Amino acid sequence: MKILIAGAGPAGLYLAYLLKRQMHGWDVRVVEQNPRDSTFGFGVVFSDRAIEFLRGDDAETFDLITPAMQTWTNLTVVHRGTPVVIDGVGFAAIGRLRLLQLLQQRLASVSVRPEYEKALQSGDELQGYDLVVAADGVNSFVRRSQGDAFGTTVTYLQNKFAWYGTTKPFGTLTQTFVANADGTFNAHHYRHSARMSTFVVECDPATWDRAGFAAMDEAATLAYCERLFAETLAGHRMVSNKSVWRNFPNLRNARWSAGNTVLLGDAQRTAHFSIGSGTRLAMEDAIALSKSMLEFKHDIGGALAAFEAARRPVVEKLVAAADASAQWYERFPEHMRLAPREFAWSYIQRSGRIDPERLRRIAPKFAGGSEI
């Protein structure tokens, strides 16, 4: 069995490890266009039980990654300078580069070495394999090389966002909402190591225009955001890493496979970053596909059909929650008219996954109006 995996992100690396671990004789090749240890962004966040989903199938990887994660049990919403703590809503985070390095270790343990700085240039390079896996992100070359075989659609949200880091290690995942003469802004921020946090700045299009970001370079934009969130940063600096303004792409595919090619992770679909499920979905994709391949082996069509049948209902449920969350953010300037506690209630119920009854069960102090 010859397998080509395009993309050495979490989905591609973890799938390669799982396939080679369970079938030592398979030829598994991983190619990645970027240099090794070159990654954009800062941290990745996992909601609820972090990487608990790994424990049953892969205790070794679970035990390797878990000590490197930062965890917390509460969530904080800051509005009008007032922090509102929501107890019982925990998250965990890890630096994206650190996660990739740990997955590279797992891959080395089964003698697979990804080929970095190897950009696929032609569809001809996808020939000669029993299975081709597109784990090469939103702008997947593998997916695009097949024309409309997957029924791909992409729409873009209106809000602008830019991904930064900061040297301030925040105590919890925090959503900080602020306003100035230009308009309204939000920062999603959480620590992903003992000394660093991820800091995502978001604003609506009208605010972006009034602030004049279109005419600013990366350094000027960083300076503006540091001034804007000076109180939140408390003297710490923000860090840029190709931190350009973007619109979030909602990518969907009507079909997850075509012939012997299958889509994984962000090449298959995107889930808005506000619910912290993108990396988890990608790694769960890898688990599900590896199980289907183990069951069906050389019946590639059967394996890919079984993979989609098992995963699509789960993915669509989470993507629906992500879409609902994203729509709340698209209208966050309107929500900011609410008082801090009412605003926090609106925020925590935005995805439709936490109704008042469940909130009273998991966050009794917040739901009961107690100060934490």
Predicted regions, residues:
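Beta1/beta-strand and adjacent pyrophosphate-binding region of the FAD-binding site
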Residues: 1-11
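FAD-binding beta-loop-beta segment adjacent to the flavin cofactor pocket
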Residues: 247-264
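Glycine-rich FAD pyrophosphate-binding loop
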Residues: 18-41
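Conserved N-terminal glycine-rich FAD pyrophosphate-binding loop of Rossmann-like flavoproteins
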Residues: 35-53
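C-terminal helical "tail/cap" subdomain of flavin- and related membrane-associated enzymes
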Residues: 21, 291-372
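Conserved N-terminal helical subregion
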Residues: 48-163, 365-372
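Conserved FAD/dinucleotide-binding core of flavoprotein oxidoreductases
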Residues: 86-89, 95, 171-250
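Glycine-rich phosphate/pyrophosphate-binding beta-alpha loops
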Residues: 252, 268-280
